[in-house]
């Protein structure tokens, strides 16, 4: 019998924030970006999720040599803190050139900008000795369907994947699907779409998925089933665990904060599939409540990590013989009651 997985956790520096939202300004003092890395180990985290401009600020204004210099400096910072860069993601949704999309923009000049920015992100990942690029295809979609040729858009996405795989012969690409926001309807809305693109690529073994709980919920799907699908194909590069209270804007609530049973099932699928045993991180993408005072605010991170580990113990202490008995008898009423009682800690 294999030994239990010793999970490692990651988050991005943006998860320590000032609490601004579309309806109001900051409510907390800013905590300096460069000081956030010193918090990770104290909070129980070993991995750092990075946007390209988290790693190298203002990179569009820098030369390749300057980008390399800045990335190398961050590599030293992370090493000194005992941290591992989990991935680098090109932040392709802020620039004026990406208003109408990035790789699927109708403008050839805008597509060229997106490709140039992507190459810079890969260069940063190389400098950090980071093995993965995450593609959140944020603005790849439309507000009205007639705005783009969808077939051509998907062809362009596949061509971009192949170009990335050719640009770096070892980098992995993890596609992070989301069905909406900031576009009305996005291309590659689910992990099934992402894995289909992976298999169509020139080196599918290096193309995987990153599943965020809230994104799956926003697609009307169960996050644990999405994870199971990716795991069955050997294509779950990472996860962004959080929660979502209904079909609305992306909330990034604390993991388990809206649906504890759904959180349990995500942990169950990951644990039973051996996720993490090959070094994969358990990534969190959670926002502190706007009402939370302090600087820096980090309880949402430690609370979500703690809840994950509590649910791991719930999975490991399930009576598997009883579960098998209920399954064999097709007595799912009894199975459900057992699961609910187990989660509540009552007999």
Please annotate each region the language model reported.
Residues 2-46, 119, 123-126, 131, ...:
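Histidine-acidic metal/acid-base catalytic patches
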Residues 4-12, 71-95, 124-126:
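Glycine-rich, aromatic-flanked loop segments that form ligand/cofactor-binding clefts
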Residues 12-16, 51-54, 89-93, 135-140, ...:
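Short loop/turn segments at strand-loop or loop-helix junctions that form parts
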Residues 19-25, 54-69, 94-112, 137-151, ...:
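Surface-exposed, active-site-proximal loop segments in enzymatic domains
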Residues 28-36, 61-75:
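Aromatic- and glycine-enriched glycan-recognition loops and surfaces
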Residues 45-57:
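Active-site loop/lid in soluble adenylation, ligation, and acyl-transfer enzymes
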Residues 67-82, 160, 164, 269:
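Catalytic-core regions built around general acid/base machinery
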Residues 81-100, 133-144, 179-182, 186:
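Substrate-binding cleft and catalytic face of glycoside hydrolase catalytic domains
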